[in-house]
A protein has these predicted regions:
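Amphipathic alpha-helical dimer-interface segment in Rossmann-like NAD(P)H-dependent oxidoreductases
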Residues: 71, 105-126, 161-162, 166
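Conserved mid-core segment of classical short-chain dehydrogenase/reductases
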Residues: 83-100, 142
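C-terminal helical subdomain
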Residues: 175, 195-248
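Conserved glycine-rich cofactor-binding loop
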Residues: 15-16
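Catalytic loop of short-chain dehydrogenase/reductase
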Residues: 127-167, 177-184
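Rossmann-fold cofactor-recognition segment
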Residues: 49-63
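Conserved glycine-rich Rossmann-like NAD(P)H-binding loop of the short-chain dehydrogenase/reductase
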Residues: 29-45
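Catalytic Tyr-X3-Lys loop
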Residues: 92-111, 129, 153
């Protein structure tokens, strides 16, 4: 899929952070982009950056939204970035409601959209990318069920890939696990929480993380992934400022 011209790309969670960078990168590469998010002003600002971007104001966790948009646009590229901000507290200060926030959003979004991608199904050769998190591998003790929800997203992506293979659908599904970054709401919350937990300033904590992953870097990395030969793609990748890396 080296030429993205005319290949409709739906980016779910495109209004800010990495999702915004991904939407802009695909639009600049010539793809007609459908940017999905709940925030009207942010979507309008994004759409003003490129004639290739159109917007859909919707709740990504609503199953009818997933069905409607997959049916209407029949995307050849589907990128799932949307999710909830975790409640940053130690385990003992969580309630079940705060602990499970990401189970009811991030996991539901991955399940709902992947289900629709398989049921429609998307056209043969389509690519689906689920943006999970590095927390899926490393854990995140100050964010309740966040890391577990991201690990489950990774599993669901692998399940969807297997179902595509079994049914001969030709859809490639991949999980991408970005490292914590200050260029998004979740990352900023995490940086504040873990800096305080370690008795550091935010600047000190950021410094030990190394070069931060930017929205532009994320966009470039996902372009490379979508353009790659499906036969060379593995089920999941870590994403840092250095690009996509296979988990060790």
């Amino acid at each position: 899929m080296s030429d993205l011209s005319g290949r409709t790309t739906v980016v779910v969670g495109a209004s800010r952070g990495l999702g915004r960078g991904i939407a802009r990168a695909f639009a600049e590469a010539g793809a007609p982009v459908v940017a999905v998010a709940r925030t009207v002003p942010a979507l309008a600002e994004l759409a003003a950056t490129s004639p290739n971007i159109r917007t859909e104001v919707a709740d990504a966790a609503d199953a009818t939204v997933a069905w409607n948009l997959v049916d209407r646009y029949e995307p050849e590229v589907l990128i799932l970035v949307a999710g909830a901000n975790p409640v940053m507290r130690p385990l003992q200060d969580q309630t079940w409601e705060t602990f499970s926030v990401n189970w009811h959003t991030d996991v539901k979004i991955a399940f709902t959209w992947l289900r629709e991608a398989l049921l429609k199904p998307l056209p043969p050769g389509s690519r689906v990318v689920v943006m999970s998190s590095g927390a899926a591998i490393n854990g995140s003790p100050a964010s309740g069920g966040y890391a577990g929800s991201k690990a489950t997203q990774r599993f669901i992506a692998a399940y969807a890939q297997d179902e595509s293979r079994r049914a001969g659908l030709g859809i490639t599904v991949t999980a991408v696990m970005p490292r914590m970054t200050p260029f998004g709401d979740v990352g900023r919350r995490g940086i504040r929480a873990y800096a305080a937990r370690g008795g550091q300033t935010e600047e000190e904590y950021l410094k030990q993380l190394g070069e931060p992953l930017t929205p532009q870097m994320a966009g470039a990395a996902l372009l490379d992934l979508v353009r790659a030969d499906p036969a060379t793609i593995v089920p999941g990748y870590l994403l840092t400022a250095a690009g996509l890396q296979k988990p060790s």
